[in-house]
Every structure is written in structure tokens, then in C-alpha cells.
């Protein structure tokens, strides 16, 4: 059979017989017509006999008559839309060596926040379009034909033709501009070797502010006109982060400039394009008067994360998407390192346990996936930008750093960056460098964590002076998987002075423990008689203690003998073990009682999350007890909340500001009348006078949620007042606060109204997930009925994986019965797509886990008695 273009269909990757060396691209975006045209001249190296050039193109019209390779005219130019490729065939084999491929093409500036797209903004009261790119993972092919895989690194030289009054930015600095009346041509310097997914273009009206690093690299923050002041905080973090990373990686920042731009419509949080980082507004802008402390923290972490990518991801790039975690896990881990250095008072490494927790919760599902995951089609890539690649990735890096030691680890990373700069690497390449530098068996240890999904629970049992350990794969459904890990075990006994460290290589092991240090003079067991495994939660695993060890830790928590990280680890492990039916809800409630005098934000953020989880399940599991359980949880949080009150105090810490917000929101969600009434009272004052300081940004969300708890169809003034604020504010953070409150109403008709409001032009598509995230238990049936009715529209409007997955997760995961799981499965039968298939399976698994947990709670003999006892104790 003669070779034909058909042979290239259905392949995971492009053929390797030709590869690009450099691209010379000219693009003309037409912002009024929402279209663009372009031409490409690509220097190509042909390395093996072939008569075809195969590259990626999607939603582009390639002009076949314009295509040339050197002076050869192709015999055929065929586009396969489903495979997102264009195949250019010639009458004979192409000469081995270098040649230039030329072609013209046209496309649409879409409204789907991927490829080359348009974003709406207001200028002087009128709506305008800006042109923006978002190419990760596989969408550069929607802007120009290219070899759209990370390993095909090339140099890029761009030329843009744009309206002369607009700012036009790309990865590299401008060489020159020539103006021809209403249009100008902008020429950019050629980039170093880079992957296609990092190419970027932004064209629109902007203000900017500027700073520079110690090396003299110019850093700018671009914002909508009039908002540049809100870029100051991010600029400061960016300049300091670049200096810090230069030292940490022992390699200078690779480009001549760095621009950061706030984009009004943006699907992700931010994107690390080389030298031109794009952000949604809430992730870059910070306003002293209008932003909350948690917004400030989010900006710092996001900026540090994206700038870490300039080394880890951009300079050294993963060879294929299987190794995505090398990009994301490292950028997440290193962003905490930077923010800890810049803001030590934020206690950032303790807050890092938020990441570890979300990684552990997702990875306890049978429908999780390994850190290194096989990718066979571009449509599968988006779905792995999840808590496994980011949070588990970052957590196993922290575990490895803790095992090897910070200095050795840093030295090895610097060697890795030097070795693979301007090139690509696989996970094994990193292990090889770390192994060489440290002399430790890194590859054997880490392969168990990256190539198999899941993680272990370590069962710990004390027998005299011997501590017996046994590992088994932990799954939230209560079963044990087949996994076996090499586990870095750390332990301390009675104090943090003498810690033991060793590797658990098999299923079981035992350790000799010296208990004398932890006993009172008389030999009896006091508050120092405790043994804690996984010290400071550096390991990515859970621990199930026997009753004696658990009692010792409970005493130690009450006596405040444990570190913040260990207090977090114990309550998180206990909650997850309860969900998996490995311990009772009764014992979890007793443990929570030990935290009643806790006042630290980092610990209480985990305690409140556990409280809200218990509250949700108890409504379905024990309706007759749920009021009492609510009261118990309220009592647990109340003293810390009363100490802080509603009003900020002079000179209080950043973490106390965050704690106030956290506790008030939790008390409102738990239905605490006093907090709800106070939130409503303050809201009424606030809507009469927006300049009042009775509701600063940090307590606004609690107040808005309180208002929505009192709204009904017949008494809806609060809902309408919130909508009015939404329509009048220009601040993205304030808009997101309101959207997250509207759907939390207990009245089903109002929930429906909020969901329908989300479909209007008044809500940007990127912001839908705020509304979805706010849905109350009372609104779950309405939300599910709404999703079924609007599914086709939703699928068309939100094609991006992360956003469509939010719709599925938010509506499905709140259910708790096998019948509901069956109903959901039936609805989606024949409707699933790779972009949300994993999210659907995980959501259904969560429903079934809840159903089993409920069954188990109903059969607990002492639950009512314990709840009663603990309530009596509170009186």
C-alpha cells in the first residue's frame, strides 16, 4: 500500500523524522472581527527519509496553496481535525538536512479561554476586546501550525500587526515598532530554545508599573487602565522571588525581561509563559482597602509559583506530559520556600499542609492516578492538572528533601538545572542527579511514590518497648489496595529532641522505643508519654495508632506539647480514618474535643474543615443527632471566635486576620444564630454606607453567607442587595465573594435563580466555579436537576477540562446514597468525554464512600451518649 496521510491518524505523538529549529511568525489579530491571520516560516531539520511533514493544527484554516518546503510544492495538504494535525505530502522524499517550511493560515479569536482568544474589558464605559493566548497544554496549535509537544524546543521570532494605540506584548522585548496610520508592526527579539506551550501574546489597553532585580532584569506588572496601583504587591514579590530563585537554583533568570499581566477572562489561576506570565485578576491584583488577607497570600503564592516555573518548566522542561508533575509539583513546593523567606510570619510551611491534605484526600480514591501517568491523546492532558500533579507532587518533594537534608537537596537541584537547561528531562533524570549528589537510593525510594498510585497507612502498636509498624495501602472506601512503599519513617517520643529516622522497606518492622524519657518520676504515664510518627507531617502517608498511643497523643494535644504540624496531622488522619470506617465518628468527636483551646490559624483551618465535613455527613447519617452535633462543633470554635470578634484589632497578625474570617464563615455555615444575626446586622449598615469600616474585606464573606441564610423567596431583599453590589463593583475579588455566597441559600428557588444568573452575560465563564462551590446541602437536588437540564449548554460553553470538571464535582459529590450514584451514572452513560471522565468517576466514588460511612455511623453504639457527654461538659 502506498504511504498516505491516513497513516498518521490516531497517534499519541508526532513522528520524529523532522523537527523544528526556529519559527518566524507573523500574526495579525483583528479585534473587531474576532479573527486573525498569520504566516509562518519554520526552519526544519529532516533527520530520516520521509515524504511527509506532520505537525499540529486545530481550528485553523491552512492555505494549501501557500505551503512550500524550500522550493518544493506539496502534492497534498490534509488537515485531520479530530487528530489536530496537518499532513503535508510531497512527491518524493525530502532531502536530509535543514530546510524552511512556509505557510499562511487564518483562525478565530475564540471566547473559550484557550488558544488565541478574546477577553472582554471596559474602557471609558464601553466594552472592548483584548487578544490573549493560553497554550498549555496543547493549544498553541490553535494559533499557528507547529510541533506542539514539549520536547520539540525551538527558537521563536514574532512579529505582530496590531492597532497602533494598543500595547502588544510577547515573551521577548520589542526590537522596533513601525506605525502605518491606524496599525503598527511590532518586531520582537528571538527567544532562546523553548517549548510551544510557553509562547505568549497579549494585545490590549494597559497601564503598567515597573521594578528591577539586583541583576537589573526589568519586571513589569500590566493591569487594566486605572488599576496599576493594585499591582504593587505582586511586583514586589516578583522582584524578590527572581533574586531568591537565582541564588537557590544557582542559575540567573534566563530572559532579558519579565512581564506579568492581569487578564479579565482566564481559565486557570495563572500561566507561566516564558517572560510573559498571565494571571486571572484575583491572582495578581491586591488592594489594601478591598482585598482580604487570604487574597494577599494567594497572590504571593501564585506569583512565586509562576516565577519558579521560569527555571523548573521553562528552562528545563518535562519531556512529555507524563512528567507534568516535575513542573507543577516543584513549582508548588518552591513557591512555599520563597514565600516562607519573604513572609516568615505567615508560617507558610505549616500552611503547606493544606496542599498535602488535598493530595492525600484525592489519592485515597481508587479512581486516583499515579504521579507519572501515561498520556495517549492531547484531550487527556488537561485532566491531570490536579491535586496529584500539584499537591502530591509537591508533598513527595518535601518528603524527599526532608530525607536527604535541605543542603544536599538544593545542591542536587542546581546540578539538575545546569545539566538540562534549554532541554527536556524525565522523572528518572532528576532521580539520577539526586542519587549521584547524595549517594542515597533515591530512584528506588521515589519510584514507589511516583509510579504507583495511592499511599500507605502505617498501623502503629506498642508492645512493651517495641513499636510494631505495618503498612497497607490506604483507601477511603475502607478496603486495602495492593501497594507497597519504601516509607521514610520519623518518630519522636515525649519530646522533639531525639528523633528516629529510618526507611520502612517491607510490609512490617519494629523499632525499640526508650520510654523512660517520657514518663513521670514515679514511672507513671504523664502528658509527656506520647509517641508521634511522621514528625511534622513530612511524609505522604497516614498513621493509625493503637488505643494506648492515641490516648497519649490526645493528652499531649490538650497539654499543648505537640508542634502545629503534628496537631494538624493527627486530626486530618483521624478524620480520614473515620471516613474509611477504620475508626468511629465517636472517637473522632472525642479527639476534636482536645482542640478546644486551640487558637492558631494553621491548626484551626484543618479543625474547621473537619468540623464542616462531620456536619455535612451527620445531617444524612443521624438527622436526630445532627442538631446536637452542630452545637458541639460550634462550641469547639466559639471561644477562639469570641476572642477575635468581628472587628480588626490594631497591630494583630496576618494569621489572626485570616483566622477571624475562617471562624466566622464556619460558624455561619454551622448555623450559629448569634454569628448569623451579627453578620446580617453589619450588612444592613454596610449597604447604606459602603465606606463604613464595619465590614472590612476579611469579614465580608461571612456576612454575605449570613445574609443568604436568611433569604427566602418571599423575603429576598438580601439577595437583591448582594446582586446590586456585584453589579456596581469593578473588583474581581469582591465579585467572587458574592458569587460564592448567592448559591448558599437554604431556599431552593433562590439557589435555582443563582445558578441561572451564572449563565447570563453578567458572570464571566471563568467565575462559574465560585457559584458552584457555594451550593448548600439544601440546594444539592436543585443543582443536580439544573445541571441535567442545562448539560448541553454547559458542555458547549465550558469546554476546558478544569471548568467542566467543576460542574460535575460540585453537583455530584454532595450526594450520599447508592441510589443517587446509580442515577448519576445513568444520566452520564454515553455522555462522558476524556476532559471530565476522571472527575465523574471520582465524584461517584465519593458518593459511595459517603454512603458506606453513613451506614457505619448509624451502627455506632455510643455516639448519642458521647455527644451528650461532650455537650454536658460544655455547659
Curated annotation (Swiss-Prot):
What's one GO BP annotation on this UniProt entry? proteolysis
Q: Where is this site: Transition state stabilizer?
A: 390
Entry's PROSITE patterns?
Answer: ZINC_PROTEASE (PS00142)
- The active site is formed by 306 (proton acceptor)
* Motif position, Dileucine internalization motif: 722-723
Keyword NADP in the entry? The reply is no
Which cofactors is this protein said to need? Zn(2+)
Q: Which GO terms describe its cellular component?
A: cytoplasm; endoplasmic reticulum; extracellular space; membrane
Segments carrying the region annotation (Required for membrane association) are 96-203
Residues that bind Zn(2+): 305, 309, 328
* Gene3D superfamilies documented for this protein: 1.25.50.20, 2.60.40.1910, Neutral Protease Domain 2, tricorn interacting facor f3 domain
Q: Listed GO molecular functions? A: alanyl aminopeptidase activity; metalloaminopeptidase activity; peptide binding; zinc ion binding
Localization, UniProt: Membrane; Microsome membrane; Cytoplasm
**Bilayer-spanning residue ranges:** none
Q: Which residues bind substrate?
A: 136, 269-273
Q: Which reaction does it catalyse?
A: Release of an N-terminal amino acid, Xaa-|-Yaa- from a peptide, amide or arylamide. Xaa is preferably Ala, but may be most amino acids including Pro (slow action). When a terminal hydrophobic residue is followed by a prolyl residue, the two may be released as an intact Xaa-Pro dipeptide
Q: How does it sit in the membrane?
A: Peripheral membrane protein
Keywords, alphabetical:
Aminopeptidase, Cytoplasm, Endoplasmic reticulum, Hydrolase, Membrane, Metal-binding, Metalloprotease, Microsome, Protease, Zinc
EC assignment: the record states 3.4.11.2
Per the entry, the cofactor note is: Binds 1 zinc ion per subunit.
Q: Which family does it belong to?
A: Belongs to the peptidase M1 family.
What does the subunit comment say?
Homodimer.
What UniProt notes about the protein's domains is:
Dileucine motif seems to be involved in protein-protein interactions.
Put simply, this protein is called: Aminopeptidase M1-B
| Organism whose genome encodes this protein | Oryza sativa subsp. japonica (Rice)
Amino acid at each position: 500500500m502506498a504511504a498516505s496521510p491516513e497513516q498518521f491518524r490516531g497517534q499519541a505523538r508526532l513522528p520524529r523524522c523532522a523537527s523544528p529549529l526556529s519559527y518566524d511568525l507573523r500574526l495579525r489579530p483583528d479585534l473587531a472581527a474576532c479573527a486573525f491571520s498569520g504566516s509562518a516560516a519554520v526552519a526544519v531539520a529532516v533527520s530520516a527519509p520521509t515524504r511527509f511533514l506532520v505537525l499540529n493544527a486545530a481550528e485553523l484554516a491552512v492555505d494549501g496553496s501557500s505551503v512550500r518546503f524550500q522550493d518544493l510544492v506539496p502534492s497534498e495538504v490534509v488537515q485531520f481535525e479530530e487528530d489536530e494535525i496537518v499532513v503535508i505530502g510531497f512527491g518524493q522524499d525530502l532531502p536530509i538536512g535543514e530546510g524552511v517550511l512556509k505557510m499562511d493560515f487564518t483562525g478565530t479569536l475564540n471566547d473559550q479561554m484557550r488558544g488565541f482568544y478574546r477577553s472582554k474589558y471596559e474602557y471609558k464605559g464601553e466594552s472592548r476586546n483584548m487578544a490573549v493566548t493560553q497554550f498549555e497544554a496543547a493549544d498553541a496549535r490553535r494559533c499557528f501550525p507547529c510541533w506542539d509537544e514539549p520536547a520539540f524546543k525551538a527558537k521563536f521570532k514574532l512579529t505582530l500587526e496590531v492597532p497602533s494605540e494598543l500595547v502588544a506584548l510577547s515573551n521577548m522585548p520589542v526590537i522596533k515598532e513601525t506605525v502605518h496610520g491606524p496599525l503598527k508592526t511590532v518586531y520582537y527579539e528571538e527567544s532562546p530554545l523553548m517549548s510551544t506551550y510557553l509562547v505568549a501574546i497579549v494585545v490590549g489597553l494597559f497601564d503598567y508599573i515597573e521594578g528591577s532585580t539586583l541583576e537589573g532584569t526589568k519586571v513589569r506588572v500590566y493591569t487594566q487602565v486605572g488599576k496599576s496601583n493594585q499591582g504593587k504587591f505582586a511586583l514586589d514579590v516578583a522582584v524578590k522571588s527572581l533574586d531568591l530563585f537565582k541564588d537557590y537554583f544557582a542559575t540567573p533568570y534566563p530572559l532579558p525581561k519579565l512581564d506579568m499581566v492581569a487578564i479579565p477572562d482566564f481559565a486557570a489561576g495563572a500561566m507561566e509563559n516564558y517572560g510573559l506570565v498571565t494571571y486571572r485578576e484575583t491572582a495578581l491584583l491586591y488592594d489594601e482597602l478591598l482585598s482580604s488577607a487570604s487574597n494577599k497570600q494567594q497572590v504571593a503564592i501564585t506569583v512565586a509559583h509562576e516565577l519558579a516555573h521560569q527555571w523548573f518548566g521553562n528552562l528545563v522542561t518535562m519531556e512529555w506530559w507524563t512528567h507534568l508533575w516535575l513542573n507543577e509539583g516543584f513549582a508548588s513546593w518552591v513557591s512555599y520556600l520563597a514565600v516562607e523567606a519573604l513572609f516568615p510570619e505567615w508560617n507558610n510551611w505549616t500552611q503547606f499542609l493544606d496542599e498535602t491534605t488535598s493530595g492525600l484526600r484525592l489519592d485515597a480514591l481508587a479512581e486516583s492516578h499515579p504521579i507519572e501517568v501515561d498520556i495517549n491523546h492531547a484531550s487527556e492532558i488537561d485532566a491531570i492538572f490536579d491535586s496529584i500533579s500539584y499537591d502530591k507532587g509537591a508533598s513527595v518533594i518535601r518528603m524527599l528533601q526532608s530525607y536527604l537534608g535541605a543542603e544536599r537537596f538544593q545542591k542536587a537541584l542546581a546540578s539538575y538545572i545546569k545539566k538540562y537547561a534549554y532541554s527536556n528531562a524525565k522523572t528518572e533524570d532528576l532521580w539520577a542527579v539526586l542519587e549521584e549528589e547524595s549517594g542515597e537510593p533515591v530512584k528506588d525510594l521515589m519510584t514507589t511514590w511516583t509510579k504507583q498510585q495511592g499511599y500507605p497507612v502505617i498501623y502503629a502498636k506498642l508492645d512493651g518497648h517495641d513499636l510494631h509498624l505495618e503498612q497497607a495501602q490506604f483507601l477511603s472506601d475502607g478496603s486495602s489496595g495492593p501497594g507497597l512503599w519504601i516509607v521514610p519513617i520519623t518518630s519522636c517520643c515525649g519530646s522533639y529532641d531525639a528523633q528516629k529516622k529510618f526507611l520502612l522497606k517491607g510490609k512490617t518492622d519494629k523499632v525499640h522505643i526508650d520510654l523512660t524519657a517520657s514518663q513521670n518520676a514515679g514511672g507513671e504515664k504523664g502528658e509527656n508519654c506520647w509517641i508521634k510518627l511522621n514528625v511534622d507531617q513530612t511524609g505522604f502517608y497516614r498513621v493509625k495508632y493503637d488505643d494506648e498511643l492515641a490516648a497519649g497523643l490526645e493528652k499531649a494535644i490538650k497539654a499543648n506539647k505537640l508542634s502545629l504540624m503534628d496537631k494538624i496531622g493527627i486530626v486530618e488522619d483521624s478524620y480520614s480514618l473515620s471516613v474509611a470506617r477504620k475508626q468511629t465518628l465517636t472517637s473522632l468527636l472525642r479527639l476534636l474535643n482536645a482542640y478546644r483551646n486551640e487558637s492558631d490559624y494553621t491548626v484551626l483551618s484543618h479543625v474547621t474543615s473537619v468540623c464542616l465535613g462531620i456536619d455535612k455527613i451527620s445531617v444524612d447519617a443521624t438527622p436526630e443527632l445532627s442538631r446536637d452535633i452542630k452545637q458541639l462543633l460550634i462550641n469547639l470554635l466559639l471561644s477562639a471566635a469570641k476572642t477575635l470578634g468581628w472587628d480588626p484589632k490594631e497591630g494583630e497578625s496576618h494569621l489572626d486576620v485570616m483566622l477571624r474570617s475562617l471562624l466566622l464563615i464556619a460558624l455561619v455555615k454551622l448555623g450559629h444564630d448569634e454569628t448569623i444575626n451579627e453578620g446580617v446586622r453589619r450588612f444592613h449598615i454596610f449597604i447604606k454606607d459602603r465606606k463604613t469600616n464595619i465590614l472590612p474585606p476579611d469579614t465580608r464573606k461571612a456576612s454575605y453567607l449570613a445574609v443568604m441564610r436568611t433569604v427566602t423567596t418571599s423575603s429576598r431583599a438580601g439577595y437583591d442587595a448582594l446582586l446590586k453590589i456585584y453589579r456596581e463593583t469593578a473588583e474581581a475579588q469582591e465579585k467572587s465573594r458574592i458569587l460564592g455566597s448567592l448559591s448558599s441559600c437554604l431556599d431552593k428557588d433562590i439557589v435555582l435563580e443563582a445558578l441561572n444568573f451564572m449563565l447570563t452575560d453578567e458572570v464571566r465563564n471563568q467565575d462559574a466555579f465560585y457559584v458552584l462551590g457555594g451550593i448548600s446541602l439544601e440546594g444539592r437536588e436543585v443543582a443536580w436537576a439544573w445541571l441535567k437540564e442545562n448539560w448541553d449548554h454547559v458542555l458547549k460553553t465550558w469546554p476546558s477540562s478544569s471548568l467542566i470538571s467543576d460542574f460535575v464535582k460540585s453537583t455530584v459529590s454532595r450526594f450520599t446514597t447508592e441510589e443517587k450514584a446509580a442515577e448519576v451514572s445513568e444520566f452520564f452513560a454515553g455522555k462522558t468525554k476524556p476532559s471530565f471522565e476522571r472527575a465523574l468517576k471520582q465524584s461517584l466514588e465519593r458518593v459511595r464512600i459517603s454512603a458506606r460511612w453513613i451506614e457505619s455511623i448509624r451502627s455506632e453504639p455510643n455516639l448519642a451518649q458521647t455527644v451528650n457527654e461532650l455537650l454536658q461538659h460544655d455547659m
